[in-house]
Amino acid sequence: FDALADESKITVVQIAPAVRAAWGESLGISREFATVKRLVAALRKVGFDYIFDTNFSADLTIMEEGSEFLERFKNRKNAKLPMFTSCCPGWVRFVKTQYPDMVDNLSTAKSPQQMFGAIAKTYYAQLLGVDPSRIFCVSIMPCTAKKYEAGVSVMKDAGAGQDVDVVLTTREVDRLIRAEHINPHTLEEEEFDMPLGVSSGAGVIFGATGGVMEAALRSAYYLVAGQNPDPDAFKDVRGREGWREASFNLNGAKVRVAVASGLGNARKLIEAIRNGTAEYDFVEIMACPGGCAGGGGQPIADGKELAYERAEVLYGLDKINNLRFSHENPSVIKCYEEFLEKPLSHKSHKLLHTDQKSWELW
């Protein structure tokens, strides 16, 4: 509230993929009516200056993480494999405390939340022509662990304080909407601001278990084959099982992948890798059963597990999106051309990657 009232501050807010499938549940509006564009309208009424989509930085994450996986896979005799996804801070913390010898298997790519913060306070500040210290970055997340991640002391690569200043959960945003006496039933749909409001269907499925893997494989295929696969070619990684595995052909090379959600399943998977009964190249793990759609910051329905219902909303949004591939997001392409140069460039490494060994635990 202080930042919203401070005229010297430019308040920028990002909305995570899974939030759009759940924000209306505790406000008494149907999932069909509670579109992300109505949430954008509510946040404008609250007073945010610019409203962006974390799906933009999910696409950016895919470009970095997918490129990193291909580098490791090419050099697999010497590289740390399997490569684990790194966008779930609950999972990263679990590895650090339970399996510290496997931290090097984590992708160094930051999560979409943290990539967004770094880009907002560098590239976007540059586009606005303002000092980065004026940008106050808020994220709306389905996850309580994102508060920990935003506060990790090394997460300030943009050089203007923490890259993400405040994290609000979906439940907290619902309370904010109520506190501002905004009637959700009367909201009209409004568009995200540009250019960090453009995203692909691959970005939106980050909110479902298996979504990060599927999005990464879509772009990895393009990067090695030079052409797009069928957008649904990798949908075998979808499903309700807590631990799923599949193998795919990437331009003649067999890639073995696994997806797990829930830390009990993560533990079983890691133990199987350790004792040699399972062998993978790329593994996605989310701490919450069902992935971010079932995150700890989402609305709670007594006796109901809604993660998979919410995931179906996200897959539906992917299906109707004109963009199905992260590498085709025009705003991501422009961000590389004007600022980052290319995936895994020196600037990309500085702003979009992290060493999880340096994360303090508290």
Give the predicted meaning of each segment.
Residues F1-W362:
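Iron-sulfur-associated redox domains of electron-transfer enzymes in respiratory
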